[in-house]
């Protein structure tokens, strides 16, 4: 998990530790131990960690011991990040070699009955989501003085819940499961409930991730292209998922353009009629080109370029890019102003790394800003991958701008 503000990355390890590496020098900076009794499965940074206003990094860890841990570390005095001119983070200024001085194990969150598979902090509220092999999703609210309160236990999945992720600008949570489905959750008055079920995958859905809220990879040059971009702006960020069925799918929301979720013009999927319903309609937009031969465990959607990277059991890392359809084809949609034509896009595989971790499976891939001396621009990105070989590898796309 790359830090949201500092040039560091945290990795979860089977030896019950979390290792923090510099993205400037690629050196090991910290080895965080002592919080869990079994292997650590997942890590996640609090989105405002290390900002000048807060001055504190907060890291959550999910473990095979069925607990989640919250770790805290102050990044220097007066709320300022302790960094040198080359963006290297000094983790030893105040703490020496004493790991307990660096990272404080603030609180343990118990409640799940078996291993925690994934966890994620909300970027819009003081909430943390965790999911588990016990088929449940828990939502925790952070209070003062290292206290967390359980605000929801969601148990509608019929299999292990593999992943949770938050919408970048709304209090909307996505979860994916061994039951082949994706569920979206919202708060309805005082209770959290399922607002959409995304079905279509033919196997375990290993990972889900929302599109960034700000990237502008596509530029409109025609009226039809601008209509598509306007439609996407109204719908908000899309969702990408990957599965045992060898597919990567992109899902989009049908925006509610009338108050209280009234039906839109044109065909619409049937839904249960409620007063003040939280239900949303999400539809499959496209499937990316099939490049993998075995289960796809991880996808990551770049918040800068809009590219998607995938990896999995076959040891491949594949990068995809969305472009305007080469044949300039359009499709028709129904709007309040009648039928309109909008442009189409297509996804193209632009890079592939085979045997990226030799003969081993790849567990996770993620985009991060490039911070080392070789970076060519402030927006250049790297891909970080972890595999069953116990290694963390870093990749660049030298041939692509």
Predicted features along the sequence, with ranges:
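WD40/WD-repeat beta-propeller blade N-cap
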Residues: 33-40, 46-47, 90, 100-102, ...
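A structural motif specific to WD40 beta-propellers
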Residues: 27-30, 79, 104-106, 149-152, ...
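Blade-level signature of beta-propeller repeat domains, shared across WD40, Kelch, NHL, RCC1
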Residues: 366, 374-401
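Beta-propeller domains
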Residues: 13-33, 76
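Short loop/turn segments immediately following beta-strands, especially the blade-tip
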Residues: 72-97, 141-146, 186-190, 252-278, ...
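WD40-repeat beta-propellers
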Residues: 18-21, 68-73, 137-141, 164, ...
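Loop/turn segments within WD40 beta-propeller blades
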Residues: 1-6, 43-56, 113, 118-126, ...
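Conserved strand-to-loop turn within each blade of WD40 beta-propeller repeats
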Residues: 12-15, 61-66, 73, 124, ...
